[in-house]
A protein has these predicted regions:
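Charged, glycine-rich active-site and insertion segments that engage polyanionic ligands
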Residues: 1-93, 104-113, 117-173
Length: 173
């Protein structure tokens, strides 16, 4: 279904403003049911965004900095205390966040719908660190972590490993 039709339906039937309807229609990728699901989801995105920003900042600082590695380990322990479903949703959110940064880095602004709400974090400043040389490895790392968490792996170990790998990958040229 074209984005315009989904956008109109969301505005007319669910009384959304144009910007919100446009964002949801874009995220739904032509699937009206997905747009409705996104509309009624439980609002984890802001919390996920805050966790993501803390994680990425710690990973960025961790290269050659033992104190920042401790921050990554603490972050991993905090996320590991959540339920598996929430961990999986968070990792899916991270994959999409990295995808949005890559699209922005490759000048595909019309496909970017993320607008970070965390103070002093701009997608435009983050995007240059996500590029063709590291996106596949980042995606594979996050997908593998998602798989292992689904299979009841130890979340603390999995997330610590992903964090250390992210530190290496985010600095890759």
């Amino acid at each position: 279904v074209p984005e315009e039709i989904i956008m109109d339906a969301l505005q007319n039937q669910h009384k959304l403003d144009q910007k919100s309807a446009q964002n949801l229609a874009h995220q739904a990728q032509g699937n009206y049911n997905k747009a409705l699901h996104l509309l009624h989801q439980d609002g984890d995105d802001l919390v996920f965004e805050e966790w993501f920003v803390v994680w990425v900042r710690a990973a960025f600082k961790a290269k050659g900095n033992a104190a920042a590695i401790q921050d990554l380990i603490q972050w991993s322990e905090q996320i590991a205390q959540l339920g598996r479903e929430k961990q999986k949703k968070f990792l899916e959110y991270c994959i999409e966040f990295f995808r949005q940064a890559l699209l922005l880095n490759y000048q595909a602004q019309q496909l970017v719908y993320f607008e970070p709400k965390v103070e002093k974090f701009k997608l435009e400043n983050f995007a240059p660190f996500i590029h063709g040389n590291n996106i596949n490895a980042i995606f594979t790392t996050l997908s593998d972590a998602l798989y292992h968490i689904e299979r009841n792996g130890n979340a603390k170990i999995i997330l610590t490993d992903v964090s250390i790998q992210l530190t290496r990958l985010i600095h890759k040229k």
